[in-house]
Amino acid sequence: MAKYRIMTFDGGGTLGALSLQLLNRLARQNPKLISRTHVFSGNSIGSFTALALASGRSPRETLQYFEDEILPAFSISRPGGPVFNQQLPYSGFIKAVRNFFPADLQLIDLRKRIVVPSFKLYSQKLDRWTPVLFHNFPGSPYLNEKVSDVILRSSGAPATQRAYQNYVDGYVVATNPSTASIAFAVGKANVPLDQIAVLSIGTGEAPTRLRRDTRGWGMVSADNIRPENLKNLPPNWGVLLDRSPNEPLLPFLQMIAGGNGYYESMVSANLLGDRFFRLDPRIPNFSKTDPAVVPAVIEIANKTNLQPANQFIEKNWGSK
């Protein structure tokens, strides 16, 4: 059995329902799963899950609040978003996150270790922008940060939501924070690599692809600026309006988010071998900002075969 156990949660907006339902099924079948986990880490909506668990909330309670209070914040979509306008008003999401946690709850107060990626648009100390990995390991400069602020700093996805306190969504750093979590376990907790196990729970693997000639593409086209006819816009790396169902709407941004998620899994698997397990069921190309997809996402989570994950948990978290 591994001596140091980490659980990670990807970003993914409304698709966070998938990872939460998978977690609920796993926790029911493995009652000691949460109590025997040393580190919870997550990005964007995954940071909400991670810090909820680290603060002592149950998977069931977290999922229920997600469905009742977090999802409604995604129900209002502004005209033109996310291409020509910020897609979602952020105020509802901010209120929902703040209401779930005590107003004065700080990272130092959490029962478990956490790692949450974000990206700071300007650091006065460095005089540039910079990745940030919020954590509460000993010596952390972030111990007095409010839990709700850390979640919101990790969740402001460019084009979908606005920056929060000069921070944007952690997906520009790590959609899947598993490698960062391993690094903190080794570097901050002094745990040998061969004693670490990671259960990494995603928000669904979609068949996103781009199979067209990209010669001549820029980030935007002149016709994309105040367009008169959206149907005749030329394709580019910034936005692809004439797309098939499995092509990305925002090619460059979605490559960053999707690519680094796969990369993190590859690196973590190479570091840990069979002590790394990725649970990320295949899903259709669902919207990450549409609450209407949640029933279908929950159904996929309920039909996912958890036997391999349960075997991994039994081996590395201990018997039920």
From Swiss-Prot:
The keyword Hydrolase applies. PROSITE patterns: PNPLA. It comes from the Bacteria. Its main location: other. One of its GO terms (molecular function) is hydrolase activity. The keyword Ribosomal protein does not apply. GO terms for biological process: lipid catabolic process; sporulation resulting in formation of a cellular spore. Residues 7-182 form the PNPLA domain. Its EC number is 3.1.1.-. PANTHER family: INTRACELLLAR PHOSPHOLIPASE A FAMILY (PTHR24138), PHOSPHOLIPASE A2 (PTHR24138:SF10). This is Putative sporulation hydrolase CotR. The gene is cotR.
